[in-house]
Amino acid sequence: MTTPNTAGINGGRAVHTKCLHRRESLIAFVLVLFAVAFNLYHLFPEVAVKVTDPNDTGMHLLATELAVEGITQGLDFTDPWMGSIGMGFPLFHYYQHLPYLSTALIHILTLRALSPFELVNWTTYLLLSLFPLSIYWSMRRIGFDQLSSAMGGLVASLTATDGLYGLDFASYVWRGYGIYPQLWAMVVMPPALAICYRVLREGRGYFWATLLLAATLMSHLIYGSIVFLTLGVLTFLPTTRLLTSEFPRVIWMRWKRLLILLVMVVVVTSYFLAPLILDQPYLNLSVLEDPRLYDSYGYSVLLPALARGELFDFDRFPSFTILLAIGFGICLRRWREERYLIPVAIFSLWLL
């Protein structure tokens, strides 16, 4: 029988726990809100100053206008002919085009309230600014607590590299490279990875996993491949069953789910992948592009750069690198919990 005194103590503990949870939620909300607000303020000149970008944005603008033309004129908007480049080129036949089609649809559905030029600038601005939300949501879906996820979102936009075409602002802003499709993939990739990981573990959620993974692939082929390879590594992370007879069965179950997911994504994107593979002999790589963009820089370059703090904090105090080292150590210390091994696996794999 519960005495009144015991009931009062239990009730007080419940109220205290509820207050702590609310406080944690408030702190997490403020941290993510600050990260987004900082990006919105810091990047506002990208849309406030209307000047032509001195980078690849010009080509992406042409592709967006081509998508608008294809949709409005009833043409095959998945494989139009771009006659404004050289003697003409079927860009969408060889190049991921979901970002262009999405921007074109926004332009049409908003009754052309904004020009394609303005839409490309505004979507770049908003996607970059909202990237912390993508990281926060994805970490929560993987199983991290609110504060850890909020801290991930807080620092998500703070990397600085020496022009490595990565996730930092230099890849997308006016003074950078203007890699518009990669920006879409960068924002969609974390949720895709989180949802797909849940499919591997629980065997449910195939629809959203297929949708997000296909969106990542059709925004940037390399980023879609990154998700698939990462999921292949994550199938080996059921550490709670590492020394039991269940381990092979769990691994096999996860691989079957990954293969099902792979087949579904290939079917959804086959309209693009099949012609791309069949017509691959006609696609040539530019001799002007650095081969390291495709082959990586190798350990001989990356490890010394990481040790010097230049890989994530180029030309500044290595604050992000220090936080990375601390987080890596915490994850290793908690290796028995599977979710903490996910950052370790991803970082170790793609340091290549």
Q: Where do the protein language model's features map onto the residues?
A:
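Membrane-embedded transmembrane-helix bundle of lipid-linked glycan/lipid transferases
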Residues: 2-3, 8-352
